[in-house]
């Protein structure tokens, strides 16, 4: 008989007392449910002084925003905990610390990050963290290299691919990224005024062929252990620090996917800034986002190359020049997945505050149109641009990258 039951606040406190690794467990007395997640219960566990000490996170057996009609496997909690533990093995400074997890209860206790802030909120507010982009690039390089064929033995890698098979969560990604936005589907969510742009995407054969290729690679290329949902809402920042959280979508997939979704969220903020700030601040913020895009990729690529030169285990993959050649393919994937993120976050099920929190309706629509046009352009141009500087130059030169005009 399964031990699983949905935690109450009292259950979360008791669990934290047992497994929170705090000096005085009995000082933990209250639990506040937090977060806007659709897949989990998340509790902040506070002590008698009201200070949050640890986080208790439990997977729900269904998608919360839909209900029990959309069931989900609880094994994703094990996959999330083990993904974070594996990533922490190679990049502890940028991965949230898992203190304990129980696969049967689908629960995890992790360090409290109350002294950090969600990066998306900070980007929207115009608060700049100068080391964040470089730290994100470092995290991506360390985690993706060390779980790839460049570092793992073939036997270990094949076993890991099996252990991290995550079909139900991957199905969500497959549908929301690569299928729903390009067909009429009840999960899609967009302002009816955008229908002409949406229909144009659905009727663009070249775009749909490119998206089909991206989906095929997502389905078939087990290159490294991905976070699987790396965006500015799953990244916490503080002065000089960055931590990733929420890895329940972890699986072995194409390396460019994690990079592309990260870059896509920087560009979603880029698209939304004219509606979030005054003209001068928006222009400065947009330039910084483009610099961040360059920094993330350049840091990732430089570190991945250095790691391959120092640590590549397979003699064939250690061949001089191969890692650089491989990164060209990763780059093209990343730009395609980046474009997919822009489109699906604008007209699909799950939106972002970078666009949706814009108060002025006409400006919001203009920013959404920009995100759609930029996403489409990136998907189509991905096979033809060899470096990040070329992509940034095209964004700067494109009329759609200028401040959106009111409709």
From Swiss-Prot:
Enzyme class (EC, first level): transferase
Q: Which reaction does it catalyse?
A: 5-(methylsulfanyl)-D-ribose + ATP = 5-(methylsulfanyl)-alpha-D-ribose 1-phosphate + ADP + H(+)
Any single GO BP term: L-methionine salvage from methylthioadenosine
Which Pfam families does the entry mention? APH
**Residues annotated to bind ATP:** 40, 57, 111-113, 246-248
Q: Which UniProt keywords apply?
A: Amino-acid biosynthesis, ATP-binding, Kinase, Methionine biosynthesis, Nucleotide-binding, Transferase
Q: InterPro entries, alphabetically?
A: Aminoglycoside_PTrfase, Kinase-like_dom_sf, Methylthioribose_kinase
Family the UniProt entry places it in: Belongs to the methylthioribose kinase family.
Biological role: Catalyzes the phosphorylation of methylthioribose into methylthioribose-1-phosphate.
Q: Which HAMAP family does UniProt cross-reference here?
A: Salvage_MtnK
The record's subunit annotation is: Homodimer.
PANTHER family on file: METHYLTHIORIBOSE KINASE (PTHR34273:SF2)
- What protein name does the entry list? Methylthioribose kinase
Organism per entry: Yersinia pseudotuberculosis serotype O:3 (strain YPIII)
Q: Write the lineage as a comma-separated list.
A: Bacteria, Pseudomonadati, Pseudomonadota, Gammaproteobacteria, Enterobacterales
Recorded name of the encoding gene: mtnK
